[in-house]
Each structure stands twice: as C-alpha cells, then as structure tokens.
C-alpha cells in the first residue's frame, strides 16, 4: 500500500503505513514561532529533536508510562501508534518563564511553590487560547475521566523527568504534553514528542537556555543546542 501524508505540522510529518493502526512520523529540519507564522530551516535539527524524544520516551516507557512510540526507523523517523489526538495542550510549569511571566508580570526564573497546570486549545488561527476543564468537556474535546488521566500522566512525567534533567545539569522549567486515543483500543496515551521544541530547559549553573528559546530570542545555534541536550541526557543515563 502506498504511504500517504496524513498530517504536516510545524516540525513533523505523519505518514500512513501498511498497518492502519500505525503511522510513520518524520522529524523535520525546521522550527517555528508565533504559532507557525515564522518558520526557519536548521540543518540537523530534526535528527537532534528526534534523538532526544526517543531517549525520553524510552525512559518514560521503562518507568511505566504508555506512549505512542513503537520503534525507531531512522535518524529522523519513528513508527508510532495511530491516535485520534485530543485537541488540548497540557502545560506543566515548575518555574516562571515565557508567557506565564508576561501574563502575570512576574520575573522569569522565579520558583513556583508547586507545579502550575494549564490547558490550551490547539488552534493556530485562534492562537491556542486558554481553556479549562469544564469548557473542554462541554465542547466534547475530552471526557472528565480522560482529562484526569492526562493530568495524572503529566504529573508522573514531571516526577520522572525533573530529577533526570537535574542529573544532566538542566532545570526542567516547563513542558507541554499532548495525548491521543490509541486507534486499536481508544485508550488515552502520551503522544507527540518530548524535546526542547515543547519544553524549557535551563543550565542549572548559568541558567542559559537549552531549548527553542535560543531560536525565539536569537541566543545561540538551535541544532547545536539540541545536540548538547542529547549528549547531556545520554551521559546522565549511562551513569545509572
């Protein structure tokens, strides 16, 4: 069966496969900001983001988190479970940064006494507006049980990854997760990716940015930054 492009996103493409319950995901050498309004090419960025996400997903799977990941196909490709995506972003904030800082007039870098949990409706034309549980349920984006399961997974991910990144000399400032209903059984699982494209990472000593903010703020080379994140994580895991 000929593969067909199912979805072309800001940093990835999803392709059909011979198995109707599986997809091929391709990580692209590009980065966007302003909800895709500004796009730039970065050689090697797709492979670097892919390497980080695969490493993190393997770690999460080893610790009991269900994800869409099946296997690596190439330096920029994975085979994943097909999912009907929940149109929500689940954002966990451990430290004040980005829009959260500007929205509330707070200083970046301020530690939060507990993780802040926020949801946003995934719609580029609407600039991904904030949404709460009652609205998401009323609009039939998710059921109450699914919403609770997504947040339970987010909390597990935070508890697992915060110490891992600390061991690698990085502070997990915040991150955004996405979930889907697995095609073969309708089970909610972690999907999309986990890379500096969808989280903020700061060096624990210098507080230098090690994420997509280096592109947003023109601070450093994006691909080299992602490669450094991967090298640090790989070294931290080898110490276990």
Curated annotation (Swiss-Prot):
GO terms for biological process: 'de novo' IMP biosynthetic process; cobalamin biosynthetic process. The keyword Nucleotide-binding applies. GO terms for molecular function: ATP binding; phosphoribosylaminoimidazolesuccinocarboxamide synthase activity. InterPro entries: SAICAR_synt/ADE2_N, SAICAR_synt_PurC, SAICAR_synthetase, SAICAR_synthetase_CS. This is Phosphoribosylaminoimidazole-succinocarboxamide synthase. Belongs to the SAICAR synthetase family. Keywords: ATP-binding, Ligase, Nucleotide-binding, Purine biosynthesis. The gene is purC. It holds the Pfam family SAICAR_synt. Disulfide bonds: none annotated. It catalyses: 5-amino-1-(5-phospho-D-ribosyl)imidazole-4-carboxylate + L-aspartate + ATP = (2S)-2-[5-amino-1-(5-phospho-beta-D-ribosyl)imidazole-4-carboxamido]succinate + ADP + phosphate + 2 H(+). Pathway: Purine metabolism; IMP biosynthesis via de novo pathway; 5-amino-1-(5-phospho-D-ribosyl)imidazole-4-carboxamide from 5-amino-1-(5-phospho-D-ribosyl)imidazole-4-carboxylate: step 1/2. It is an enzyme of class 6 (ligase). Its EC number is 6.3.2.6. HAMAP family: SAICAR_synth.
């Amino acid at each position: 069966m000929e593969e067909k492009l199912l979805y072309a996103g800001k940093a990835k493409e999803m392709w059909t496969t011979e198995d109707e319950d599986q997809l091929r995901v391709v990580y692209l050498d590009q980065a966007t900001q302003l909800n895709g309004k500004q796009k730039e090419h970065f050689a090697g960025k797709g492979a670097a983001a892919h390497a980080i996400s695969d490493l993190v997903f393997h770690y999460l799977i080893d610790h009991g988190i269900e994800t869409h990941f099946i296997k690596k196909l190439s330096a920029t490709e994975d085979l994943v479970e097909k999912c009907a995506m929940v149109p929500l972003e689940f954002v966990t904030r451990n430290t004040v940064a980005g829009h959260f800082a500007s929205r509330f007039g707070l200083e970046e870098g301020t530690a939060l006494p507990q993780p802040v949990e926020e949801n946003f409706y995934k719609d580029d034309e609407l600039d991904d507006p904030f949404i709460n549980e009652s609205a998401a349920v009323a609009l039939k984006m998710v059921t109450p049980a699914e919403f609770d399961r997504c947040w339970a997974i987010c909390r597990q991910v935070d508890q697992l990854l915060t110490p891992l990144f600390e061991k690698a000399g990085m502070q997990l400032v915040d991150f955004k997760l996405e979930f889907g209903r697995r095609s073969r059984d309708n089970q909610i699982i972690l999907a999309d990716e986990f890379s500096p494209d969808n989280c903020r990472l700061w060096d624990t000593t210098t507080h230098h940015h090690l994420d997509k903010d280096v592109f947003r703020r023109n601070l450093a080379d994006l691909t080299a930054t992602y490669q450094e994140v991967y090298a640090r994580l790989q070294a931290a895991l080898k110490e276990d």
